[in-house]
Amino acid sequence: GIGFKAGVKDYRLTHYTPDYETKDTDILAAFRMTPQPGVPAEEAGAAVAAESSTGTWTTVWTDGLTSLDRYKGRCYDIEPVAGEENQYIAYVAYPLDLFEEGSVTNMFTSIVGNVFGFKALRALRSEDSRIPPAYSKTFIGPPHGIQVERDKLNKYGRPLLGCTIKPKLGLSAKNYGRAVYECLRGGLDFTKDDENVNSQPFMRWRDRFLFVAEALFKAQAETGEIKGHYSNATAGTCEEMMKRAVFARESGAPIVMHDYSTGGFTANTSLAFYCRDNGLLLHIHRAMHAVIDRQRNHGIHFRVLAKALRMSGGDHIHSGTVVGKLEGEREVTLGFVDLLRDDYIEKDRSRGIYFTQDWVSMPGVFPVASGGIHVWHMPALTEIFGDDSVLQFGGGTLGHPWGNAPGAVANRVALEACVQARNEGRDLARQGNEIIREAAKWSP
């Protein structure tokens, strides 16, 4: 008897611990699991905890060289999902020591890694996570955050306005710059590179950045307002991405952009450090998120991707519109919008928030509403998102029958009218159309 017993044993013997009291330093995760027929929920939950932390499929003698009690993930609660057959929420607690400081990449490799391919589960979805201050404090977080951005731009008391330049592919740099100028001159705060625009044969990045910088300065001089264009620094290598960010800064641009799902968290965090050190704002686009978050029973919910981005670093992030052309439910969307911009968010299952999240002093991120919205949505958007948001109208600006600048004017007039009406105590939900119609009389 050397005390080592080889062989396969049930995960639930070691990793299902219903009487465990979670620690303040634990990283907590809620998983929606659909076990294979015949697999008990406790075994499935324990398997998730084990496979995303210290466990493997069999007992190994090297287990004796460490303290599993200290390092193992524990499934501490399981609840059936109402209205679903054979679906459960498993709550898992991970000890802080399992994760590298300041690395979203490492955190995701564990908690949303191999376990998602696990045979005993038909499907698995990460619904929410609780990041303790002990861990979140090791991350850079947003390079600047909502308050500093408002101070840099000198824009207060209203949402910010943006516009994605369309057609997204095919314009020359010169014509692209012209479209940027017209939108900014008309009254928008920002214009945006479409996420597909990197550096293609029809428009190389350096040419675009230069013509855009010219447009920025011209529009600023004529309007007396600070303007920005999200120059997309996303590239095939981290080095090339940094080169583009440096060039954007040297051209006098106030903000750059990155696709954090396709570019990856490692690249994103590097860029966030550069942006903080050099006074650049960082706009984050979420291309590829729907591949990961759209299925109800498998994948990662966007609120988890949003929390990860707040830690990795970004000043703006796309987060759905509630009213536009892309999917999103109102309460759930507002739940993760608050997770992005508030300090302290109470657990509230009706909004999809499984854990109370305390960000302590980490700056907030502007949620960006973008995708199929236009001027008639303005009252709803103002009411749903409030002041701390960026509202982006691509086709909703450039599709104006008189052209880009009048489209921009229309959006700015509508926004100012909605903010004023709200401040005067009018009901945006009920009187929205009327407010917009009134405003239109004074708009070109």
From Swiss-Prot:
Entries under InterPro entries matching the protein: RuBisCO, RuBisCo_large_chain_AS, RuBisCO_lsu_C, RuBisCO_lsu_C_sf, RuBisCO_lsu_fd_N, RuBisCO_lsu_N_sf, RuBisCO_lsuI
A single GO molecular-function term is: magnesium ion binding
- Modification type N6,N6,N6-trimethyllysine: residues: K5
Keyword Metal-binding part of the UniProt annotation: yes
Where located?
Answer: Plastid, Chloroplast
Q: Say what the protein does.
A: RuBisCO catalyzes two reactions: the carboxylation of D-ribulose 1,5-bisphosphate, the primary event in carbon dioxide fixation, as well as the oxidative fragmentation of the pentose substrate in the photorespiration process. Both reactions occur simultaneously and in competition at the same active site.
Q: What is this protein called?
A: Ribulose bisphosphate carboxylase large chain
The organism of origin for this protein: Osmundastrum cinnamomeum
